[in-house]
């Protein structure tokens, strides 16, 4: 018998055809090609920048504080929205001094990057500039707003009654308050006292003074002081005796 034929090695598969070069025949000096390449590079850089922003960001205010004008004795709420990566630490300040949580002040946060400063029973001591500070490891941001009170006109201290010798000088002082700053009207016997001659005034946000020189018998009597602003009015009285 014939010996078995030797097995022939399998034929190697044919090599795949070389992939076509997508840039073959492209003129890199063509203005259209240059413009397209520039746009692609710019888009890639923007994508990298966006990714970097997702990884880190200094704090930024997306909603800033607003100035507040409120009635004395009411509650005040300052609100801001601020974000950053990592999340910033928030602090509140009044005229440069940190505001701490307590019976007078409450600091709150919501789940949308919002922060609140609540001031209870606002009074004159609360007037000033409030600042929200946001800080993380990449930087800090600030925003500020003012608090002003609206206070009805009032007399904070009644004037004293006066006794003066004829020919002497005297003054009547009334202490006042109000925001907006009140006007003061002086009258005697229902007649307004005009400035000039023996009569002069000194006015400030906290007081008003009527000065009278060389007192005469006709200066004796009851003086009325009316304190007025847009929110209200008040009256004060004083009696003068001339000996």
Curated annotation (Swiss-Prot):
Chain residue ranges for the region called Disordered: 1-22
Q: Where is the signal peptide?
A: none
What is the protein name stated in its UniProt record? CAVP-target protein
Q: What does this protein do?
A: This protein is the target of CAVP, which binds to it in a calcium-dependent manner.
Identify the residues that the record assigns to the IQ domain, covering every copy: 35-62
The residues covered by the Ig-like C2-type domain are: 59-150, 151-243
Organism expressing this protein natively = Branchiostoma lanceolatum
Q: At the top level of its lineage, which domain of life is listed? A: Eukaryota
- Check the record and name the PROSITE patterns matching this protein: IG_LIKE, IQ
Q: State the organism's lineage.
A: Eukaryota, Metazoa, Chordata, Cephalochordata, Leptocardii
Which stretches are tagged as biased composition: Low complexity? 7-20
Instruction: Write out the GO MF terms.
Output: protein kinase activity
Task: Write the record's keywords in alphabetical order, separated by commas.
Answer: Immunoglobulin domain, Repeat
């Amino acid at each position: 018998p014939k010996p078995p034929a030797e097995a022939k090695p399998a034929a190697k598969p044919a090599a795949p055809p070389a992939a076509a070069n997508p840039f073959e025949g492209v003129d890199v000096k063509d203005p259209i090609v240059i413009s397209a390449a520039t746009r692609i590079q710019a888009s890639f850089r923007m994508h990298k920048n966006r990714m970097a922003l997702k990884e880190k960001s200094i704090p930024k205010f997306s909603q800033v504080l607003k100035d507040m004008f409120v009635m004395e004795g009411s509650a005040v709420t300052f609100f801001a929205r601020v974000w950053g990566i990592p999340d910033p630490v928030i602090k509140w300040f009044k005229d440069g001094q940190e505001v701490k949580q307590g019976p007078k002040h409450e600091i709150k946060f919501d789940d949308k990057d919002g922060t609140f400063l609540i001031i209870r029973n606002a009074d004159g001591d609360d007037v000033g500039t409030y600042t929200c500070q946001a800080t993380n490891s990449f930087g800090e941001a600030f925003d500020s707003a003012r608090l002003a009170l609206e206070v009805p006109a009032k007399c904070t201290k009644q004037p004293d009654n006066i006794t003066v010798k004829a020919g002497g000088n005297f003054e009547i002082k009334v202490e006042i308050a109000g925001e907006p700053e009140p006007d003061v009207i002086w009258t005697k016997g229902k007649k307004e006292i005009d400035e000039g001659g023996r009569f002069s005034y000194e006015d400030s946000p906290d007081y008003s003074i009527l000065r009278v020189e060389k007192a005469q018998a006709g200066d004796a009597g009851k003086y009325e002081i009316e304190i007025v602003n847009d929110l209200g009015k008040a009256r004060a009285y004083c009696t003068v005796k001339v000996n």
